[in-house]
Amino acid sequence: MRHFLTLKDFSAQEILEILALSKEIKDDLKKGIRPPLMQGKVLGMIFEKSSTRTRVSFESGIYQLGGMGMFLSNRDIQLGRGEPMKDTARVISRMVDMVMIRTSGHERIEEFAKYSQVPVVNGLTDSYHPVQLMADYLTMMEQGKDQNPIVAYVGDGNNMTHSWLMLASKLGFELRVATPRGYEPNLKIFEEAQKIASLSGAKITLTNDPKRAVEGADVVTTDTWASMGQEEEKEKRARDFQGYCVDSALMGLAKSDAIFLHCLPAYRGQEVSEEVLEGPQSLIFDEAENRLHVQKGIMVWLDRKRS
């Protein structure tokens, strides 16, 4: 049995296999074909952090596959009243076929997976957001940006950065990360990615200069400066991230056919300008839609590995 907690746990071949399956499922859906690949299966969806895209995409996805989704917030289950994660895992996993968790500390989902009898999918933790990266890379593939691409990430060294580090190191492409001083990615995760990159041929660089990162890039991406739970730091971060807005001038340093990605929600005028977000290079809504398709692919792949 396999879980989908971080891309670190998957080989390049497995990542591409899931993406190919996701593309096949997407193509079928566009033709009006909805094969019941998870007929009668139940997905338990534990949300300790709220979300728009994660809930709608997972719930729609499992229904389209012939199963059903069960939304569980902290108000609905005993986790919100202090029940240990390992107890919750041993109960819920006896009653559903798969669990998706969106939570804070990555150690929480690791503990759940340790005690779970069914596959567990990471819908987001403070350390990683792997389902989003699968959607991002599917979007890149659809635009022909998966052949030795140069990806520039500009912004906070957060869970998105960590997931980009893992994806780049596994698939062997060039990733340039630009963050303000003091906002670099987690050192342990960065070093892990560098070790994997030494085997795959990936080139990973860290800089405090957004222009250096974006120059000649095929893909430019960013994320909100203040993530959920960091609202009190919002004003300080806005000052510290001056010069890190992906505007037309910065985007103009990338290749002329470069694409712009953002996991959303986006804050116009902060991490990205209105002009770039609504411009022809922006694929943010294709990217958001691809969350649906890759998550269906992930669920089907995990379900088959369990069989």
Swiss-Prot record:
List the GO biological process terms.
arginine biosynthetic process via ornithine; citrulline biosynthetic process; L-arginine biosynthetic process
Annotated carbamoyl phosphate binding lies at 51-54, 78, 102, 129-132, 263-264, 291
Q: What is its EC number?
A: 2.1.3.3
> What's the superkingdom here?
Bacteria
A GO molecular function term, named singly, is: amino acid binding
Q: InterPro entries recorded for this chain?
A: Asp/Orn_carbamoyltranf_P-bd (IPR006132), Asp/Orn_carbamoylTrfase (IPR006130), Asp/Orn_carbamoylTrfase_sf (IPR036901), Asp_carbamoyltransf_Asp/Orn-bd (IPR006131), Orn/put_carbamltrans (IPR002292), OTCase_ArgI (IPR024904)
The metabolic or biological pathway listed in the UniProt record of this protein is: Amino-acid biosynthesis; L-arginine biosynthesis; L-arginine from L-ornithine and carbamoyl phosphate: step 1/3
Matches recorded under Pfam families? OTCace, OTCace_N
Q: Spell out the SUPFAM superfamilies in the cross-references.
A: Aspartate/ornithine carbamoyltransferase
GO CC entries? cytoplasm
The protein's role, per its UniProt record: Reversibly catalyzes the transfer of the carbamoyl group from carbamoyl phosphate (CP) to the N(epsilon) atom of ornithine (ORN) to produce L-citrulline.
Record-given protein name = Ornithine carbamoyltransferase
What species was this sequence derived from? Wolinella succinogenes (strain ATCC 29543 / DSM 1740 / CCUG 13145 / JCM 31913 / LMG 7466 / NCTC 11488 / FDC 602W) (Vibrio succinogenes)
What taxonomic lineage is listed for the species of origin?
Bacteria, Pseudomonadati, Campylobacterota, Epsilonproteobacteria, Campylobacterales
| Underlying gene | argF
